UniProtKB/Swiss-Prot annotation:
Keywords: Cytoplasm, Lipid biosynthesis, Lipid metabolism, Magnesium, Metal-binding, Phospholipid biosynthesis, Phospholipid metabolism, Transferase. It is found in: Cytoplasm. Pfam families: PcrB (PF01884). It comes from Cenarchaeum symbiosum (strain A). Pathway: Membrane lipid metabolism; glycerophospholipid metabolism. Its cofactor is Mg(2+). GO terms for molecular function: imidazoleglycerol-phosphate synthase activity; magnesium ion binding; phosphoglycerol geranylgeranyltransferase activity. Sn-glycerol 1-phosphate binds at residues 172-178, 203-204, 225-226. This is Geranylgeranylglyceryl phosphate synthase. CDD domains: PcrB_like.
Length: 247
């Protein structure tokens, strides 16, 4: 276990659920990225995720990572949508397999192409099963995902159990950036029962109540992204952090 994973697990002993802020490297300039990251850390975020589901530029990602690291002290974790999102300078990477993709490229081939760069750049790899829930979002389209229906928690649990048996230490349930509704608590609970690792939930979480429901259902971390980039209030982010942070 690397330093970033150890830090996150240590924080989980103090907080019920962690908050991760997602910054899309394609839509953020230096000032906005730094302002968002600085504000997210002040609001109570435990880590900054940098990435996106569309195609990106490695040099641009590296620049944004450097800008964010200058402005914050919390870990910066890459969340790449493709091999071009593997860039130097970050503290770690969600080394993910999109397990319910219909395209083998996103299950194992992109990982094989990106792995040498992860090693070269000295990135801490966080082995992650990435599961797309529902349909109609960018990640569903770009990743050729066979989206798990929102009302089918047992399917998500089966994938998560497979991830556990494959040795993955993280599962990320992704409703998608800007999703109309978040992952349902029933699905989070089912996955929590099947998977004893670090459970991340993202997509469609826009307020304290949605965050609280995900936390109470068993999420170890929730991801907030679109709300911030759309001009969402950092005060609201702070309230979300407060709603999920109780031990």
């Amino acid at each position: 276990m690397g330093a970033v994973e150890a830090r996150l697990r240590s924080e989980l002993k103090k907080r019920k659920t962690l908050l991760f802020a997602l910054i899309d490297s394609e839509v953020s300039d230096t000032k906005s990225a730094q302002d968002l990251a600085r504000g997210a850390e002040k609001a109570g975020a435990s880590a900054i995720l940098v990435g996106g589901s569309s195609t990106g530029d490695q040099a641009e990602t590296s620049r944004i990572v450097g800008d964010i690291k200058e402005a914050t002290t919390i870990p910066v974790i890459l969340f790449p949508g493709n091999v071009t999102g593997v860039a130097p300078g970050a503290d770690a990477i969600l080394f993910s397999s999109l397990m319910n993709s219909e395209n083998p490229y996103f299950i194992t081939q992109a990982q094989a192409l990106g792995a040498p760069s992860v090693l070269k750049f000295g990135l801490e790899a966080l082995p992650t099963a990435y599961l797309v829930i529902g349909e109609g979002t960018s990640v569903w389209f770009v990743g050729a995902a066979r989206g798990i229906p929102l009302g089918k928690p047992r399917i998500a649990a089966a994938y998560s159990l497979a991830a556990r048996f494959l040795g993955m230490r993280f599962v990320y349930l992704e409703a998608g950036s800007g999703a109309e509704s978040p992952v349902k608590p029933e699905m989070i609970r089912a996955v929590r029962e099947a998977f004893d690792g670090f459970l991340i939930v993202g997509g469609g979480i826009r307020d304290e109540e949605a965050a609280r429901r995900a936390s109470e259902a068993g999420a170890d971390a929730i991801v907030i992204g679109t709300m911030l980039e759309g001009g969402g209030s950092l005060d609201k982010l702070s309230r979300i952090a407060g709603a999920i942070g109780g031990t």
